[in-house]
Amino acid sequence: MTQSVCILGVTGSIGQSTLKVLAQHPDKYSIYAITAHSRIQELVEICKQFKPKRVVVPDEHIDQLRQLLLQAGLADIDILSGTTGLVSVAQDEAVDVVMAAIVGAAGLLPTLAAVKAGKRVLLANKEALVMSGNIMMQAARDHQALLLPVDSEHNAIFQSLPSNYLTLENTGQPQLGVSRILLTASGGPFLDYPLEQLSEVTPQQACKHPNWSMGQKISVDSATLMNKGLELIEACHLFSISEHFVTVVVHPQSIIHSMVQYIDGSTLAQMGNPDMCTPIAHALAWPDRLQTHVPALDLFTHTHLDFREPDTNKFPALNLARQAMRAGGLSPCILNAANEIAVDAFLKLQIKFTVIPEVIEHVLNHVQNDTAVNIEQVLETDMIARQIAHQYVNQIRG
C-alpha cells in the first residue's frame, strides 16, 4: 500500500527535489495534492506526470489552470485556491505525508494545519517554526504529529542525535549525553568579500550560492547569514535546546551538514554531497532508508575540510537572530517578518545588501514583544512588523 503525499510548494526547489525522490519510488508513494504560487505551466506538466487528485493555486490563477488542465485531459482534478485551499489539502484525511515547502510566512497556516491533523510533516519551511515556535511544537505533541526536519543541517543533527530525541520534553538543556549542537554554514557567496564591498553587491551575485541550488529568498538569506540565524532558532525548537548550546561553524565545502557533540568527547557528524534529495528521502522513509540518485561521498576527492568562526561584524544578521531567540516570545516572528520585507526590497533594488540587517534591527526595536499565546497573535504581530518594515524601507528610499 502506497503512502499518500501532499507537496506544499511543488514548483520550488524543495518541491522539485521531492518529485525526483518520489518518482524513483512509485511502489511506495503516490501524490494526492500539490500546490503552487505561480509557474502555472510548470504545474500543469507536473499534473500530467503525477496525476494528483487536488491542486491549489492563488485565486488569480484558477481560470488559467482550469483551462490548461481541460486541454490536457485532466478536468477531473479538483482545483482549490488561497489559504483555505492550502489548509484543506494539508489536513485532508486522504493524506499521510505533507511536505511543507512553501517559502516564508505563507507556509505557516497550512503547515500548522497538517500538524494539527496528526500528519507526518516534512518540515522544509523553517519560517513557519520560527514564527510560531512553541505553538507549533505543542501542537505536534498534542496531536501526535511526526515533525521531521528537511533542512540539510537539521536533518543532519537529527541523524546524529539519539533516535528518541524528538520526543523529549523541552527543558532548554542538552539531554541523553548531548553537550552541544554544531550548526554548519557554507558562509554564502560573500564569505571572503571585504566588508566595504558588501554595500555594492547585487541580487544576482547574492543568489549565486557556491554549493546549493536554491530559490531567491533563501539564497539572499544565506548571503546575509540570516538563513543560519533562522536555522538556529529552528534547531532550538526542534531539539528542545537553548541557543546557548548551539554553535554556528562556517564550513565552506558543505560536506559536513552539521554535528552533535557529546559529554564523553565524541562528535558525530553527518556527511554527504550537497543535494537536498538526501534529507528529503531520509525524512520520507525514517526510520527506514530510500535509495536516491545522489552518489555516495567520495572522500578521496575532498582532500581537506575547512572550518572557521562566523564574522558577525560583517554579517550582523546572525547575532540579531540569536538575540531574538534569547528574547523569546514573539521576537523571532518579528525578526522573520522584517527579514522577508528587507530581502524583498533588496531583490527589487530598493535597498542595499548591507541595509537588510539595519531594517531588521529597526523593526525589532519598534515592535512590542510579548508571549505568543495563539496563532492569531502571531499573525497580527507578523502584520505589524511588516508594516513597520515597509515604512522604514520607504523612509530609506526617501
Curated annotation (Swiss-Prot):
Pfam families: DXP_redisom_C, DXP_reductoisom, DXPR_C
Necessary cofactors: Mg(2+); Mn(2+)
Entry keywords, A to Z: Isoprene biosynthesis, Manganese, Metal-binding, NADP, Oxidoreductase
GO molecular function: 1-deoxy-D-xylulose-5-phosphate reductoisomerase activity; manganese ion binding; NADPH binding
Positions with a binding annotation for Mn(2+): D151, E153, E231
Stored SUPFAM superfamilies: 1-deoxy-D-xylulose-5-phosphate reductoisomerase, C-terminal domain, Glyceraldehyde-3-phosphate dehydrogenase-like, C-terminal domain, NAD(P)-binding Rossmann-fold domains
Record carries keyword Manganese: yes
One Gene Ontology term from the biological process aspect of the record: isopentenyl diphosphate biosynthetic process, methylerythritol 4-phosphate pathway involved in terpenoid biosynthetic process
Residues at which 1-deoxy-D-xylulose 5-phosphate binds: K126, S152, E153, S186, H209, S222, N227, K228, E231
Pathway(s): Isoprenoid biosynthesis; isopentenyl diphosphate biosynthesis via DXP pathway; isopentenyl diphosphate from 1-deoxy-D-xylulose 5-phosphate: step 1/6
Disulfide partners: none
Enzyme Commission number: 1.1.1.267
Reactions accelerated catalytically: 2-C-methyl-D-erythritol 4-phosphate + NADP(+) = 1-deoxy-D-xylulose 5-phosphate + NADPH + H(+)
Alphabetical list of InterPro entries matching this protein: DXP_reductoisomerase, DXP_reductoisomerase_C, DXP_reductoisomerase_N, DXPR_C, DXPR_C_sf, NAD(P)-bd_dom_sf
Signal peptide range: none
UniProt-listed HAMAP family: DXP_reductoisom
PANTHER family linked to this entry: 1-DEOXY-D-XYLULOSE 5-PHOSPHATE REDUCTOISOMERASE, 1-DEOXY-D-XYLULOSE 5-PHOSPHATE REDUCTOISOMERASE, CHLOROPLASTIC
Family membership: Belongs to the DXR family.
Designated name of the protein: 1-deoxy-D-xylulose 5-phosphate reductoisomerase
Lineage: Bacteria, Pseudomonadati, Pseudomonadota, Gammaproteobacteria, Moraxellales
